[in-house]
Amino acid sequence: MRGRTRVSLALAGALVAAAACATGAVQGEAVWLMTEGEAALAPAPATRAPLPNDGPVITIITPQQGAEVTSPFPVEIQFEPRPGGALPKMDTLKLTALKIFEIDITDRVKPYVGESKLFVKEAKIPTGRHRLKLTIEDAAGKQTGQILEVTVR
Protein backbone atom coordinates (compact mmCIF):
# COMPACT_ATOMS: atom_id res chain seq x y z
CA MET A 1 0.00 0.00 0.00
CA ARG A 2 2.88 2.39 0.73
CA GLY A 3 4.11 2.14 -2.87
CA ARG A 4 0.70 3.16 -4.16
CA THR A 5 0.55 6.12 -1.76
CA ARG A 6 3.95 7.37 -2.92
CA VAL A 7 2.96 7.02 -6.57
CA SER A 8 -0.34 8.80 -5.88
CA LEU A 9 1.44 11.65 -4.09
CA ALA A 10 4.02 11.94 -6.87
CA LEU A 11 1.26 11.96 -9.48
CA ALA A 12 -0.69 14.58 -7.52
CA GLY A 13 2.44 16.75 -7.30
CA ALA A 14 3.02 16.43 -11.04
CA LEU A 15 -0.60 17.39 -11.75
CA VAL A 16 -0.34 20.46 -9.51
CA ALA A 17 2.87 21.51 -11.29
CA ALA A 18 1.25 20.98 -14.69
CA ALA A 19 -1.77 23.04 -13.62
CA ALA A 20 0.54 25.83 -12.45
CA CYS A 21 2.25 25.85 -15.84
CA ALA A 22 -1.06 25.86 -17.68
CA THR A 23 -2.29 28.90 -15.75
CA GLY A 24 0.90 30.89 -16.13
CA ALA A 25 1.65 30.60 -12.43
CA VAL A 26 5.30 29.59 -12.88
CA GLN A 27 7.31 32.72 -12.14
CA GLY A 28 10.51 31.55 -10.49
CA GLU A 29 13.55 32.39 -12.56
CA ALA A 30 14.17 34.80 -15.40
CA VAL A 31 13.30 33.36 -18.81
CA TRP A 32 15.54 33.76 -21.86
CA LEU A 33 13.28 34.66 -24.79
CA MET A 34 16.23 34.81 -27.20
CA THR A 35 19.76 33.46 -27.10
CA GLU A 36 22.82 35.61 -27.81
CA GLY A 37 23.20 33.87 -31.17
CA GLU A 38 19.58 34.49 -32.15
CA ALA A 39 19.75 38.13 -31.06
CA ALA A 40 22.90 38.66 -33.14
CA LEU A 41 21.18 37.63 -36.38
CA ALA A 42 20.40 40.36 -38.90
CA PRO A 43 16.97 41.93 -38.45
CA ALA A 44 14.13 40.97 -40.76
CA PRO A 45 13.65 43.30 -43.71
CA ALA A 46 10.84 45.81 -43.23
CA THR A 47 7.56 44.59 -44.63
CA ARG A 48 4.51 46.51 -45.68
CA ALA A 49 2.20 43.53 -45.57
CA PRO A 50 -0.51 44.24 -43.00
CA LEU A 51 -0.98 41.82 -40.14
CA PRO A 52 -4.39 40.22 -39.70
CA ASN A 53 -6.69 42.21 -37.42
CA ASP A 54 -10.00 40.32 -37.34
CA GLY A 55 -9.45 38.27 -34.19
CA PRO A 56 -8.90 39.06 -30.51
CA VAL A 57 -7.75 42.47 -29.29
CA ILE A 58 -4.08 42.36 -28.23
CA THR A 59 -3.14 44.89 -25.54
CA ILE A 60 0.56 45.14 -24.74
CA ILE A 61 0.68 46.40 -21.16
CA THR A 62 4.43 46.18 -20.69
CA PRO A 63 6.92 46.87 -22.13
CA GLN A 64 5.54 49.83 -24.01
CA GLN A 65 5.91 49.85 -27.78
CA GLY A 66 9.42 51.08 -28.72
CA ALA A 67 10.53 51.18 -25.09
CA GLU A 68 14.14 51.00 -23.91
CA VAL A 69 14.41 48.41 -21.16
CA THR A 70 17.02 46.70 -19.06
CA SER A 71 17.02 42.90 -19.05
CA PRO A 72 15.33 41.19 -17.28
CA PHE A 73 12.04 43.05 -17.71
CA PRO A 74 8.37 42.14 -17.30
CA VAL A 75 6.20 41.21 -20.26
CA GLU A 76 2.44 41.48 -19.83
CA ILE A 77 0.08 41.13 -22.76
CA GLN A 78 -3.72 40.89 -22.51
CA PHE A 79 -5.96 39.13 -25.05
CA GLU A 80 -9.67 39.96 -25.20
CA PRO A 81 -12.52 39.22 -27.59
CA ARG A 82 -13.13 41.88 -30.20
CA PRO A 83 -16.58 43.50 -29.61
CA GLY A 84 -19.07 40.93 -30.86
CA GLY A 85 -16.21 38.47 -31.42
CA ALA A 86 -15.35 35.07 -30.02
CA LEU A 87 -13.06 34.31 -27.08
CA PRO A 88 -9.31 34.14 -27.70
CA LYS A 89 -7.92 30.61 -28.08
CA MET A 90 -4.77 30.87 -25.99
CA ASP A 91 -3.40 27.63 -27.43
CA THR A 92 -3.07 29.41 -30.80
CA LEU A 93 -0.80 32.14 -29.40
CA LYS A 94 2.43 32.31 -31.37
CA LEU A 95 5.44 34.50 -30.56
CA THR A 96 8.28 34.88 -33.05
CA ALA A 97 11.47 36.93 -33.10
CA LEU A 98 11.75 38.75 -36.42
CA LYS A 99 15.30 38.24 -37.60
CA ILE A 100 16.62 37.40 -41.09
CA PHE A 101 14.18 34.51 -40.65
CA GLU A 102 11.43 34.14 -38.04
CA ILE A 103 12.47 32.34 -34.87
CA ASP A 104 9.54 30.67 -33.11
CA ILE A 105 9.94 31.33 -29.38
CA THR A 106 6.40 30.28 -28.41
CA ASP A 107 7.52 27.24 -26.41
CA ARG A 108 9.69 29.49 -24.21
CA VAL A 109 6.65 31.44 -23.01
CA LYS A 110 4.00 28.68 -22.91
CA PRO A 111 4.37 28.15 -19.15
CA TYR A 112 3.47 31.83 -18.67
CA VAL A 113 0.25 31.83 -20.71
CA GLY A 114 -2.89 32.17 -18.61
CA GLU A 115 -6.59 32.21 -19.42
CA SER A 116 -6.44 35.58 -21.18
CA LYS A 117 -2.91 36.90 -20.83
CA LEU A 118 0.78 36.27 -21.20
CA PHE A 119 2.77 37.32 -18.13
CA VAL A 120 6.50 36.80 -17.77
CA LYS A 121 7.80 38.46 -14.61
CA GLU A 122 11.43 38.47 -15.76
CA ALA A 123 12.03 38.12 -19.50
CA LYS A 124 15.63 38.17 -20.68
CA ILE A 125 16.71 39.25 -24.15
CA PRO A 126 20.29 40.16 -25.09
CA THR A 127 21.23 43.79 -25.73
CA GLY A 128 19.95 45.28 -28.98
CA ARG A 129 16.85 46.36 -30.86
CA HIS A 130 14.37 43.53 -31.28
CA ARG A 131 11.04 42.98 -33.01
CA LEU A 132 8.67 40.30 -31.77
CA LYS A 133 5.53 39.25 -33.62
CA LEU A 134 2.48 37.99 -31.72
CA THR A 135 -0.40 36.22 -33.42
CA ILE A 136 -3.52 34.68 -31.91
CA GLU A 137 -6.85 33.32 -33.12
CA ASP A 138 -10.28 33.42 -31.57
CA ALA A 139 -12.72 30.52 -31.26
CA ALA A 140 -14.18 31.45 -34.68
CA GLY A 141 -10.75 31.13 -36.34
CA LYS A 142 -10.24 34.87 -36.85
CA GLN A 143 -6.65 36.02 -36.34
CA THR A 144 -4.90 39.13 -35.04
CA GLY A 145 -1.22 39.94 -35.23
CA GLN A 146 0.87 42.65 -33.64
CA ILE A 147 4.55 43.62 -33.62
CA LEU A 148 6.31 44.59 -30.39
CA GLU A 149 9.51 46.59 -30.81
CA VAL A 150 11.83 46.86 -27.82
CA THR A 151 15.42 48.01 -27.30
CA VAL A 152 17.38 46.27 -24.56
CA ARG A 153 20.23 48.27 -23.00
Locations of the language-model features?
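Short, compositionally biased P/S/T/A/G/V-rich stretches that sit at domain boundaries
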Residues: G24-P74, E80
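Aromatic sugar-binding surface patches on proteins
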Residues: P111-F119
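Surface-exposed, short loops/turns at beta-strand junctions within beta-sandwich domains
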Residues: E122-R129
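Extracellular and select intracellular beta-sandwich modules with Ser/Thr-enriched
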Residues: Q143-I147
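Short beta-strand edge segments in extracellular beta-sheet folds
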Residues: E149-R153
